[in-house]
């Protein structure tokens, strides 16, 4: 999965897919009532990127729905996975549940079209703070109570704060998420800084073990050719990047073209890939 980073305006969906992304990451900010308000990152953000692009969440979700609904004039077949980077910093552990409930209701209305012919992409709820695990509980409960529990088959979970893996596993369990139940594990840092692959290697080892909790592992945010090669050699499942074309180029190199391929809609993002 080539994951286009910080896609917060609708026009950027086409921009990143045209560069080779089959997945995008979108930042979601919340108002004082725990309601998702904007697709917006703000400062600081990655080097060489403009931090202030934004849409109203409802508008972005409708644009995203069109881009991922077969038959729509805006449909992009390649776009199969969306990571919502949830900026829950202004939520408390007590309002996180409400935030998750309201975000599920918003996705149901504006992205899934009330459960009728909505967008088809898989969704990852990515939360930076393990203390906000109740966001996941609220999200899941809202879909169940609305009679759309079936949509949870399209939803995965990630804690993105580079916490201890056992602590993340515990937070997932508190949220009601079982081991390997659609669990993506991220590791990374802004492209302005360097980061070792130590935790990536630890997460990959967990993913590949008989008693791990991780389904897939992705690394963010990289675009240097050497770093991309190192990440692929570490056997990650996804790479988040500002330059999808760089990842495409590396995948086409002799040492990788027979080991990796781009994921398609037929590849289940929740299944452990047996190497």
Swiss-Prot record:
Tissue expression summary: Expressed by the venom gland.
Keywords: Cytolysis, Dermonecrotic toxin, Disulfide bond, Hemolysis, Lipid degradation, Lipid metabolism, Lyase, Magnesium, Metal-binding, Secreted, Toxin
Catalytic activity: an N-(acyl)-sphingosylphosphocholine = an N-(acyl)-sphingosyl-1,3-cyclic phosphate + choline; an N-(acyl)-sphingosylphosphoethanolamine = an N-(acyl)-sphingosyl-1,3-cyclic phosphate + ethanolamine; a 1-acyl-sn-glycero-3-phosphocholine = a 1-acyl-sn-glycero-2,3-cyclic phosphate + choline; a 1-acyl-sn-glycero-3-phosphoethanolamine = a 1-acyl-sn-glycero-2,3-cyclic phosphate + ethanolamine
GO annotations of cellular component type: extracellular region
Active-site residues, as the UniProt record annotates them: 5, 41 (nucleophile)
Gene3D superfamilies, per database record: Phosphatidylinositol (PI) phosphodiesterase
The protein's role, per its UniProt record: Dermonecrotic toxins cleave the phosphodiester linkage between the phosphate and headgroup of certain phospholipids (sphingolipid and lysolipid substrates), forming an alcohol (often choline) and a cyclic phosphate. This toxin acts on sphingomyelin (SM). It may also act on ceramide phosphoethanolamine (CPE), lysophosphatidylcholine (LPC) and lysophosphatidylethanolamine (LPE), but not on lysophosphatidylserine (LPS), and lysophosphatidylglycerol (LPG). It acts by transphosphatidylation, releasing exclusively cyclic phosphate products as second products.
Name the record gives this protein: Dermonecrotic toxin LamSicTox-alphaIV1ii
